Amino acid sequence: MATLSQLVDNLVATTFELDGPRVRIGRHPENDVQIDEISVSSRHAFIDVEPNAYLEGTTDYFISDNNSTNGTFVNDIRLTERQRLNNNDVVRIGWNIFRFVDEDENTLEKTAFILEE
């Protein structure tokens, strides 16, 4: 299972498990990942957890901004549409920095495969 780890001075402060199907992120207490900080919108972003279409037993994670005031960024690029998260991506929600970690993807990087048409 993948995680989203909040970083403070490049050290992990808090880790959240992404056990979907949809993980809601924001300031409101009803979110799965609650960030009580002024730069975060009440319903800031969400991560969809979906089975991979090609590799049975693997999972993909897609992040979307939910029309937040200060935006959602992946690797310093502001999201304008849904984006797939990759292992070690850096996610910024308001002024808060997170690292996306997917240990299963890390294992798959060592495996080559050919898709049949």
Where do the language-model regions lie?
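Structured interaction and signal-relay segments at domain junctions
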Residues: 9
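Regulatory inter-domain linker segments that are low-complexity and enriched
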Residues: 1-6, 55-59, 96-117
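Forkhead-associated
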Residues: 19-90, 95
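Short, mixed charged/polar active-site loops
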Residues: 12-15
